[in-house]
């Protein structure tokens, strides 16, 4: 088995494409297959090497690896060879209409209630007429000639049986006037050459699939298995590169854990509940492409933030040991305590600083703080220190328990809320507690 993911490097990787990449990768890895990463960069003016680099980084960030990687721009010579073969066999033909002329044709067809399908008038041109057009300075674009008598059928892994009548489809342009190949033909040539067995992509490619099946047949190659995923929606609009904040770069900047995003994207739109997974293997083991429904799924960034907390709560110390070391935390006990109280990993450093550094405590009542200091139990802090301390304070001053805890937390941490104070005292330590209270 070989699947492929083929992004165009014209922008940052967005969540819709990331989901497709994850599904392709998990589908093949769940069956011990191979994964191919291809960059569709035939349009050299719009493609940018910086986007290739960023897509590679983003895919690695969400734990995707690959067995083969290449750029289509490295294969132009081969595309040209196949292109000429298809012209010779009558599968591709030259057209000379301008964009304006094609637009007029479409408008006339629609005006008369006809489908806006290309009329193949270029097939009627004589060699003399073609020569005259070229003398005018017109450069041809090229179309693939569809078999319009066929209803293309395939059994889709997600959508079931699909039937597309090619009589309702225009012969697709495969090469533009400027010599640039469109998406269609190079994609088919690559799939054939690399023996791609399964093509998984969004349902917006269903019509393209019917066209490409005929192209594959023209190359006398085996048609792969196809799967078309329902699209993701955000605020009732399709996810696209133009939707701000929905690229992987922005997701990372929001401090989302890779496994939180992967867990969400793989389960979104399936019959499985969306749950937190902390490693890819467990997610692969639960994967089944048949569980995807046919309806579009609503993408909700706030749900990913909730899932992020759950992923952090399940991470063992060994998984985050190196990251913790980078912020000066080497205590497994602190990690297992604090992981249940954070939404983002950066909060670990914040609470470590609160415990170990000089902070500015908030004091509402200086006299009360003197009483608190005098009532502090002897010995090192343990899980019983807080309860003993509170009892001693209440024996000295009449104060509501809620107010007592709030003032104590403010004086020791500078914050109104936070992790369980009884355990937090252990990590702050007796010396720091006394130093903070003595400031007042």
From Swiss-Prot:
Enzyme class, top EC level, equals: ligase
Q: What Enzyme Commission number does this protein have? A: 6.1.1.17
Give a Gene Ontology cellular component term annotated to this protein. cytoplasm
Positions occupied by motif 'HIGH' region: 7-17
Keywords of the record: Aminoacyl-tRNA synthetase, ATP-binding, Cytoplasm, Ligase, Nucleotide-binding, Protein biosynthesis
**For this protein, what reaction is catalysed?**
tRNA(Glu) + L-glutamate + ATP = L-glutamyl-tRNA(Glu) + AMP + diphosphate
Concerning InterPro entries, the annotation shows: aa-tRNA-synth_I_cd-bd, aa-tRNA-synth_I_codon-bd_sub2, aa-tRNA-synth_I_CS, aa_tRNA-synth_I_cd-bd_sf, Glu-tRNA-ligase_bac/mito, Glu/Gln-tRNA-synth, Glu/Gln-tRNA-synth_Ib_cat-dom, GluQ/Sye
The keyword Protein biosynthesis belongs to this UniProt entry's keyword annotation = yes
Where does this one sit in the cell?
Cytoplasm
Sequence motif: 'KMSKS' region, positions: 238-242
BP terms from Gene Ontology: glutamyl-tRNA aminoacylation
Q: Where does ATP bind?
A: 241
Its biological purpose: Catalyzes the attachment of glutamate to tRNA(Glu) in a two-step reaction: glutamate is first activated by ATP to form Glu-AMP and then transferred to the acceptor end of tRNA(Glu).
Which family does the entry's similarity section mention?
Belongs to the class-I aminoacyl-tRNA synthetase family. Glutamate--tRNA ligase type 1 subfamily.
Quaternary structure, per UniProt, is:
Monomer.
Annotated protein name in UniProt: Glutamate--tRNA ligase 1
Protein source organism: Wolbachia sp. subsp. Brugia malayi (strain TRS)
What taxonomic ancestry is recorded?
Bacteria, Pseudomonadati, Pseudomonadota, Alphaproteobacteria, Rickettsiales
């Amino acid at each position: 088995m070989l699947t492929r993911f083929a992004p165009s490097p014209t922008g940052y990787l967005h969540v819709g494409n990331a989901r497709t990449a994850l599904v392709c990768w998990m589908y093949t890895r769940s069956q011990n297959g191979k994964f191919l990463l291809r960059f569709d960069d035939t349009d050299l003016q719009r493609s940018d090497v910086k986007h290739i680099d960023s897509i590679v980084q983003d895919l690695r960030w969400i734990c995707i690896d690959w067995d083969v990687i290449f750029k289509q721009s490295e294969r132009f010579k081969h595309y040209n060879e196949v292109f000429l073969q298809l012209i010779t066999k009558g599968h591709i033909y030259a057209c000379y209409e301008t964009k304006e002329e094609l637009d007029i044709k479409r408008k006339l067809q629609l005006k008369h209630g006809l489908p806006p399908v290309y009329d193949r008038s270029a097939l009627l041109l004589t060699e003399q007429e073609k020569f005259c057009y070229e003398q005018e300075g017109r450069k041809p674009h090229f179309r693939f000639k569809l078999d319009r008598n066929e209803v293309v059928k395939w059994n889709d892994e997600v959508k079931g049986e699909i039937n597309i009548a090619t009589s309702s489809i225009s012969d697709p342009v495969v090469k533009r006037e400027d010599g640039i190949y469109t998406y269609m033909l190079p994609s088919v040539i690559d799939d054939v050459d690399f023996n791609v067995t399964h093509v998984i992509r969004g349902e917006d490619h269903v019509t393209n699939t019917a066209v490409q099946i005929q192209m594959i047949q023209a190359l006398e190659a085996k048609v792969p298995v196809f799967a078309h995923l329902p699209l993701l929606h955000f605020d009732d609009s399709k996810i696209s590169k133009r939707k701000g904040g929905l690229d992987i770069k922005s997701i990372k900047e929001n401090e989302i854990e890779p496994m939180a995003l992967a867990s969400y994207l793989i389960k979104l739109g399936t019959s499985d509940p969306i749950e937190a997974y902390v490693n890819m293997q467990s997610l692969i083991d639960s994967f089944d492409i048949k569980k995807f429904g046919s309806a579009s799924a609503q993408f909700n960034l706030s749900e990913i933030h909730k899932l992020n907390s759950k992923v952090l709560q399940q991470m063992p110390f060994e998984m985050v040991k190196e990251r913790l070391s980078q912020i000066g935390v080497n205590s497994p006990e602190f990690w297992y305590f604090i992981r249940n109280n954070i939404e983002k990993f950066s909060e670990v450093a914040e609470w470590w600083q609160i415990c170990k550094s000089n902070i500015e405590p908030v004091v509402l009542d200086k006299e009360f703080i003197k009483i608190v200091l005098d009532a502090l139990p002897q010995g090192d802090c343990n899980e019983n220190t807080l309860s003993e301390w509170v009892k001693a304070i209440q024996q000295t001053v009449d104060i509501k328990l809620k107010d007592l805890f709030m003032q104590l937390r403010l004086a020791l941490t500078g914050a109104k809320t936070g992790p369980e104070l009884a355990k937090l005292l252990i990590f702050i330590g007796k010396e720091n507690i006394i130093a903070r209270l003595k400031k007042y």
